[in-house]
Amino acid sequence: MAFRHITKEDLTSRLEDPQLFIIDLRSNWENSTLKIRRARRETPEDTNLWLADYPKKSEIVLYCSSPGEKDSLRIAEILSAAGFENVSVLSGGWAVWETAGLPMEKRISDPLSKGVVPNVGKP
């Protein structure tokens, strides 16, 4: 199935659209510092666990760093089969966005993902 591709220019112009969900499919080490502004990190291997978090009628833009947007296209296929109607893939993925210096933000680190366990309940 062919999915719509969205250009970096089109995505930039829509970054503040509250109906738009931008999903970062890169691996943890790839997205450890920066991501596209407003993007949410989702694990491709756990797609069936997180797809219910998104309204099926909303617009979803996927991006990754795999050659030819391979990971984004694979997840777009899964979302489409699950009834999502408006799924796009960022043309050129993360590399195009980063090279162009478009709006990015620092990823909020999760202490548990780095093996740091907070001292809960200890003095």
Language model segments and positions:
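Rhodanese-like catalytic fold shared by cysteine-dependent sulfurtransferases
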Residues: 1-16, 20-21, 28-61, 66-123
